[in-house]
């Protein structure tokens, strides 16, 4: 018995010294490093304790240092945090050849549902990006605009029923915008009318709830996918299944089979992905691209149903969160500054008056103050508070002797850079004018809400258009007041900035001014 205890103590002691030496990796290399990392979670200890989301845990490290680059530990994995905006842009764009992969979990062979455009590596990513780019041309987005507007009108109709004829009512505008975004994505990607306003328990909303379940397992698994992909790969190879991905696969399979059986064609992203499966490409011609096309057997390598699902899944999960949050945060911030709210509401009224009471794709894109407001929102509340890459070849940090070894995870605290007074004076103040040509009160190098370089978000224009449309619909039909002037508290799980208690405002009915 004593021998077993002694053996256990010896093994634990050896393990401790091994980990301690492991956590001296950056110090041994003479690299500036974060000195408060705890074993075994590194700077993510607060994520494991469910006190902070991953993005805000990284932000805490950002604000405690003044170094351009900093050695950190993500779980037990040495990584590099970049705090300098110029260097961040170099990593994402000019020096892309050294950082062309995100380094997150992907297993094309054994887990094709993981092979989405966000996760894919090397040539696989380049090929998928090339195939998907035609999905997001101006012509394609314009053809989907009427679908988005119909859903915006359903949102307005729902709120009109909920609000009293006179006076204000408290509303969680984030919940409203999430329903709007889910319906937009379900319709413009899958061609399905789920109507989350009237049917809140639909299968798409359930997918979001499942993906967001706030528990320790999800926190740990999310960290592994991003930070320790080898462990995530091992789990999937021994039989672990992603219930959200499998549910999405079933939806895609049923929808594709129904369309092909009945010859149904819709102007949505899934139709383009079906075309990609059948022909190996998406037609640049916007009229042809939505037709049913087949290719002769053996001429073109097509993609699988699982690959279609992987792309639809990432667009759905990422799109519904960023679209809904951007619209909700914009309305919340405007409500705190009545003069800004009135200015944008006037722009909405003027645009409607010039276009016979309608918002068109072209008129939306001409609304200058709306664009400034959305830019300031995604500056203060970036859709992803961190940007991640993997060093794909040894890289010497410019103007230093520090070398980032191949295979090292690289993290950019976008939330940190966007909230740094060095780049954005008075960063906690919501100031759309900082982006105007007259003021230009910010460092353009530091503004990277969708990333930068070849891996910049492929669907950024689609997201911005749908967010702007939602804002227009609300300001056209409702008056908005803030409940209280306070900063939003965020959930302590996941990566995105998800409000812990919703985003609450007061709405009342409004008669649009069309002249």
UniProtKB/Swiss-Prot annotation:
Its cofactor is heme. One of its GO terms (molecular function) is heme binding. Gene3D superfamilies: Cytochrome P450. It is a peripheral membrane protein. One of its GO terms (cellular component) is endoplasmic reticulum membrane. It is found in: Endoplasmic reticulum membrane; Microsome membrane. Its main location: endoplasmic reticulum. Its EC number is 1.14.-.-. Keywords: Endoplasmic reticulum, Heme, Iron, Membrane, Metal-binding, Microsome, Monooxygenase, Oxidoreductase. InterPro entries: Cyt_P450, Cyt_P450_CS, Cyt_P450_E_grp-I, Cyt_P450_sf, Insect_CytP450_Detox. Heme binds at residue 457. May be involved in the metabolism of insect hormones and in the breakdown of synthetic insecticides. Belongs to the cytochrome P450 family. This is Probable cytochrome P450 6d4. It comes from Drosophila melanogaster (Fruit fly). The lineage of its organism: Eukaryota, Metazoa, Ecdysozoa, Arthropoda, Hexapoda. The gene is Cyp6d4.
């Amino acid at each position: 018995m004593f021998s077993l205890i002694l053996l256990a103590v010896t093994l634990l002691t050896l393990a401790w010294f091994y980990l301690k030496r492991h956590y001296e990796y950056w110090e041994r290399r003479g690299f500036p490093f974060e000195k408060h990392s705890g074993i075994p979670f590194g700077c993510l200890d607060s994520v494991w304790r469910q006190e902070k989301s991953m993005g805000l845990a990284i932000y805490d490290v950002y604000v405690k240092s003044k170094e351009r680059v900093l050695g950190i530990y993500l779980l037990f994995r040495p990584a590099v945090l970049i705090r300098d905006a110029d260097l961040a842009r170099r990593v994402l764009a000019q020096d892309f050849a050294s950082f062309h992969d995100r380094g997150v979990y992907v297993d094309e062979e054994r887990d094709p549902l993981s092979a989405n455009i966000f996760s894919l590596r090397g040539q696989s990513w380049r090929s998928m990006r090339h195939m998907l780019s035609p999905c997001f041309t101006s012509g394609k987005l314009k053809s989907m605009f009427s679908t988005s507007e119909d859903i915006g009108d359903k949102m307005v109709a729902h709120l009109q029923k909920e609000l009293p004829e006179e006076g204000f009512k408290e509303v969680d505008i984030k919940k409203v915008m999430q329903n709007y975004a889910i319906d937009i994505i379900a319709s413009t990607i899958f061609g399905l009318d789920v109507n989350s306003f009237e049917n809140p328990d639909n299968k798409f909303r359930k997918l979001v709830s499942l993906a967001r379940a706030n528990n320790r397992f999800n926190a740990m698994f999310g960290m592994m996918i991003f930070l320790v992909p080898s462990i995530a790969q091992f789990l999937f190879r021994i039989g672990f299944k992603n219930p959200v991905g499998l549910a999405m696969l079933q939806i895609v399979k049923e929808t594709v089979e129904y369309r092909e059986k009945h010859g149904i064609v819709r102007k949505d992203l899934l139709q383009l992905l079906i075309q990609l499966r059948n022909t190996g490409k998406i037609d640049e011609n916007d009229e042809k691209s939505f037709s049913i096309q087949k290719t002769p057997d053996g001429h073109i390598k097509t993609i699988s149903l699982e690959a279609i699902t992987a792309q639809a899944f990432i667009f759905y999960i990422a799109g519904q969160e960023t679209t809904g949050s951007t619209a909700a945060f914009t309305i919340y911030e405007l409500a705190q500054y009545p003069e800004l709210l009135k200015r944008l509401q006037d722009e909405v009224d003027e645009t409607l008056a010039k276009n016979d009471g309608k918002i068109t794709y072209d008129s939306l894109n001409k609304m200058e103050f709306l664009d400034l407001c959305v830019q300031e929102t995604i500056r203060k509340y970036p859709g992803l508070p961190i940007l991640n890459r993997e060093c794909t070849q040894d890289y010497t940090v410019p103007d230093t002797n520090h070398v980032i070894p191949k295979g090292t995870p690289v993290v950019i605290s976008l939330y940190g850079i966007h909230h740094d007074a060095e780049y954005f004076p008075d960063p906690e103040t919501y100031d759309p004018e900082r982006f105007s040509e007259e003021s230009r009160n910010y460092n353009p190098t530091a503004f990277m809400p969708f990333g930068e370089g070849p891996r910049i978000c492929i669907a950024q224009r689609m997201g911005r258009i749908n967010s702007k449309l939602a804002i227009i619909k609300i300001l056209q039909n409702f008056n908005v007041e803030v409940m209280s002037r306070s900063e939003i508290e965020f959930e302590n799980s996941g990566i995105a900035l998800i409000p812990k208690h919703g985003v609450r405002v007061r709405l009342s009915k409004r008669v649009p001014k069309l002249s």
